[in-house]
Amino acid sequence: MKKKQASHVKLLLVITLIIFAAVTAFVVMNTEEKATTNKVMKELPSIGNQPTLGKEDAQVSVIEFGDYKCPACKAWGEQIFPQLQKDYIDTGKVKFSYVNVLFHGTESKLSALAAESVFKQDPQAYWIFHKEIFKAQPENHDAPWITSEKLLEIAKTYTPNINITKLEEDLNKQTEQEEVNRDEKLTQDYGVEKTPSIVVNGTMLSDPYDYEEIKNLIEKALKEKK
């Protein structure tokens, strides 16, 4: 009887050790996979005068490469950005910049031109306009919806300080084309292949929705700055 009990104990011990080893291996492999799939850049192209939220001298920089036509970017702005803003931007630890990506053609370009025009008029109003464009994105996002009329309507409704006549003129003349060209060059320089792409102090995340990984990269950067 005692031998049987001893055998059961040994069996349970072996099973426990196997499970522990498997879990440990999974955690290690998962950590290594994140480390290898995140893209680390040794030389960071300057983002110049991009729309930026937060303290200018914040220790950590987070950049979003996004497209107003992109549903995944809308979701990131609704699900992840509010956490980032509360935890790090509003506390002065992170400055957040946005770069337009034109992966969806004419509508992407038109919305980028409008956003750049609003930014030039009023950097604070820009962020309201930016948010409202994404909110206006319909469920059927693939159907054409970004038009000059729609963008002017958003500006009139949510950014009353913006000169609508000037915005309309800028859209008709593509006044901010040079700024949009700069965004396209940044997209190329950073090797952006999807939207949204999130870069934390030179590390582009493989999964932009992994807020824990975003936090890990920020906390690591903050410690390195001390």
Labelled PLM ranges:
Residues 66-69, 74-156, 190-193:
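Structural alpha/beta surface segment adjacent to cysteine/selenocysteine redox centers
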Residues 30-64, 86:
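N-terminal, intrinsically disordered, polar/charged segments of Gram-positive cell-envelope systems
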Residues 22-27, 49, 60-61, 106-110, ...:
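Extracytoplasmic/periplasmic mature domains of Sec-exported, cell-envelope-associated bacterial proteins
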Residues 42-45, 51, 74, 101, ...:
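Flexible, active-site-adjacent loop/turn segments at secondary-structure boundaries
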